[in-house]
Every structure is written in C-alpha cells, then in structure tokens.
Amino acid sequence: MTMTLLSYLSSLCREATLSAFPQIDTFSPDITQSTKEHFGHYQCNDAMKLARTLKMAPRAIAEAIVNHIPKEIFTSIEIAGAGFINFTFSKEFLNNSLKTFSEELSSGFRVKDPKKVVIDFSSPNIAKDMHVGHLRSTIIGDCLARVFAFVGNDVSRLNHIGDWGTAFGMLITYLQEEPSEDIENLEDLTVLYKKAHARFAEDAEFKKRSQTNVVALQAGDPSALKLWKQICAISERAFQKIYNILDIAIEKRGESFYNPFLPEIIQDLENKNLITISDNAKCVFHEGFSIPLMVQKSDGGYNYATTDLAAMRYRVNNDGADKIIIVTDMGQSLHFQLLEATALAAGYLPNKETFSHVGFGLVLDSEGKKFKTRSGENIKLKELLDTAIDQAKATLKEHRPEISDEEISSRAPILGINAIKYADLSSHRVSDYIFSFEKMLRFEGNTAMFLLYAYVRIQGIKRRLGIETLDLEATPNIQEPSEEALALALLRFPEAIDLTLKDLCPHFLTDYLYMLTNKFNAFFRDCHIEGSSHQKERLYLCALVEKTLAAGMHLLGLQTLDKL
C-alpha cells in the first residue's frame, strides 16, 4: 500500500542499523507513534532490543544508528533515557507529505499486489428474525469489505444464509398439514416456526414425517421444493429491508448452494485417510484438539462442518480466493479452528494465511447481561434499528429545537444508524460491550455524532465563504503547533488502514477518526481561518480533513450530513 510515515521511517532505521552494524543479518525495526508530544512524532526502541545481541550499551547503539540516518527531513532526532530515539519531522517535510497524501486520497490508496478476498458475514437463518447478534457480524463484515476494497482488492461479500437442514422438514410438514396458515410475511413465518418446533418436540410421529420431508427435499421433491422456495423468499425479503436500512451490499450464497459437493467432500477425506469412525460418525481428529471435527453424522446426514469444508474448497478453487474471512461470534472459534486444521490437511487451503475467523464478543445491556427482551428472547434487529431512529429524533428535538419536523425526519435515520454502527465498531471486536442509546447519541466523546459535528463545521465554513468545493491545489504552509499536529494526524490515515487490515479490527479506524477530529477541533480553536492572512493554507487543511473524515466514515459504513 501507500508508504506511510511509519513505514518510511522504519525503512530509514533499518538501513541505518544495517549500515552501522553489518553483522546483523535480518532486522525489523520497532517504530511506534509517540504517545506524548515532547517525545517527538515517532519513537524507535531498537537500541534496547539489540543491546544483548551486540553486547553494547543501548545509548551507544542508538548513537550509531542516528549517525547513519539522513537528517534533512527532521527538525530533531534525540536520544532519550536508556536509548530511545525520538524523531520529529520538519515542517517542510510535512508540507510535502501533505501534497502527496492529498493526491493519493483523491486517487485512492492501492496495495502493490491486490488479492481476491472473500468475506462471509451476516448469515442469518431462514424463517427466523435477524436479531442483535447479527448486527455485529453484519457491520463488522461490511466495514472490512469496504476497507479491503478501498486499497484495491477484489472483494466478494457473501451471505452464508442458513437455508437448509432439519428445520425445513419441520416447517414443510407443518405447512402441508395446516394449509390454512398464512405465511405472507416473516413475522407470521417466525410464529409458524415456533409452532412447528413445539410440535416437533412433542409429537414423535410429526418428527418422523418431518425427517421424511428432509429426505424428500434433498431428493428434489417438487412440492417440498416449492414450499422451501416460498419460505426462503419471504425471509430474504425481510432480510433485504434490514440491509437497505444499514446500507449493506451482500450476495446471497446459502448453505444449500454447497449440497451437491457434500458427498465428494466425504469421499475425498476418506481417500486422504483423514476420516476416523467414532460412535458410528465420520470424524477428523487433530493433534492438540480434545474433540474432533464431525463431518458426517451416524445416520449418514451431513452437518455444518461438511458444508463449511465444501464452502472453503469452493471459495479457493472456484472463486479464486487468496484470503477467506468469516465473521461470526467468538463462541464458534473452536469450530473454525478445527475447520481450518481439516481444510489444511485436506489441501483445501494452500496455507494458514489464507483463512481468518473474525470473532466478536457479545452485546450487553446496562446490567452487563446478554442483551435480550424482558421475556428472555433475542431482540429483533429491525425493532432495534427503529428505536435508534426514534431516539435520534428525540435527540435532535432536544438539541436542535429550531429545525422543522421534516428536517428531523430526514436526518434522524442517518444519525440513528450511524450511532449504532459506530458504537459497535469502536469497541474492540473480541470484547463484549454495553449497548446504550444515551451514550452513542452524545455530541461529545468517541461517537459518530462527534465526528459528524466536525464534518458539519467544515460545511458551515464553506457556506459562510460562499464556496462549494474547498481547493486541494493550494500549497500547505504549516506554522502553528496545532497546524502541525493536525497535519501529522492526517498523514497517519494510511497507518490506521494498515492496522485495520492487519488485525481485522475496525476499532483502529474509529480510534484514528476520533483522534483526527480532536486535532481538527484544536486547530479550529487556535487558528483563525475565515478572513485571516493564512485563510488559503488553512482552508487546504480543512479540505483534507473533510475528505479524510468522509472517506473514513464511508469505510465504517456511516453517512455524512451537511447540517445537523
């Protein structure tokens, strides 16, 4: 990807270290952003790490490294403490870097070697409502897809819908025996599912007939297939309404797609001597795991593992995936570890780098318990999104009493959905987080509203000056400390993208945008813009903030507004 300040400085330090100490064969510099301004812009900790290898004092190592680093682009290079090297870039270097950054921001950051990336996310089950658990998978997966595409990768967004299995035999049987039931919408279908499930649990004969219908469905029985397609279509329409609200683009490729490949998966695993019979089921055992991966049940039926293996192989062989990412809750971590081990053993994955399970934690209520209704059921996602929009309307009425009901109605959906997405994405994905409308709709703090307020502030500057588009052709001229801090923050955008891609964690992006917004607010406070002798140069910084905020918010799946 675009060379970042961090990667550029790393290359300088690597060359300097190898020049100073040619006896070192391989070396990867340890450069970090400085945590405090008096430590400069970046800090190098290599001298301490090399002390034992080189049998030298860290400060002497640091001095030798510094002697081999070109000084022209720095205001200062200081050795501090036991041997930390603190780097501060010159204003001239930052000015030149801003011009390059501006061009790349307009044309797009691009990786040198684009990959085919398949991201499997959301994945609700047919005949069931999407609930709050699907929220995390959907928006984390969407964010990662946006970021991978932003840097030039070819991204496939797949919805591995649960559209096959015993539940369909149960539903089909119930519909055949209760033809008066109306299933014109998902709400009725969900009620129907509960009725069918209750009968399946209580009535042994109904259970047998349901299992017979599963076999009939698998065999392609016309009447069973017709009902199955009807059930799927109703659910998919309801799912699409939610995807429209969340601005999610995703391609359906459900479990049923892989049905034709399941027998050959079992045969292939047997041919490769990977199958062990355990309690009449076909399993794959792996060293280091206490349980096996069951790939065929004792009754001869297939399961999730069989389908997931078929999907893994198809995505590599047919989709040409260089990278496969599956976004589900952390509770499925062991399943995907076993799946990866089996796929590697079978040759379905070329290497361990090909597959990543992106796990996430729970959404909790204010008491720290799993977020559910009072009756203990999962909260329906559609109801949660509707509530977010209503809460955003109330927030706007409180903070913007002067705007019309029409304006409130047009802005509230954007503010409400932005707030929900940002609150989720700003939490480390593996952590649980407490869901709070009150916190996520605040104008202060690490919220979507806080970012949007800065973006809207820039739109206000443009309106007051009668400017439609801010000029990115100006020449930057950093003078004040808050200008320098803002310039440095802008130039760190590619670093945030790098971290997000490396660890598959969107919170690096939200942390960056929050930091950038704080630096912009300090700049806005300290540096007079409109009518000042530095108006042109400062509007240039505003233009870069505007574009960076818009780009960053888009990567999170958030929308911008010109007014709040």
Curated annotation (Swiss-Prot):
Its main location: cytoplasm. One of its GO terms (biological process) is arginyl-tRNA aminoacylation. A motif ('HIGH' region) lies at residues 124-134. It is an enzyme of class 6 (ligase). It catalyses: tRNA(Arg) + L-arginine + ATP = L-arginyl-tRNA(Arg) + AMP + diphosphate. One of its GO terms (molecular function) is ATP binding. Keywords: Aminoacyl-tRNA synthetase, ATP-binding, Cytoplasm, Ligase, Nucleotide-binding, Protein biosynthesis. The keyword Zinc does not apply. One of its GO terms (cellular component) is cytoplasm. Its EC number is 6.1.1.19. Belongs to the class-I aminoacyl-tRNA synthetase family. Monomer. This is Arginine--tRNA ligase. It comes from Chlamydia caviae (strain ATCC VR-813 / DSM 19441 / 03DC25 / GPIC). The lineage of its organism: Bacteria, Pseudomonadati, Chlamydiota, Chlamydiia, Chlamydiales.
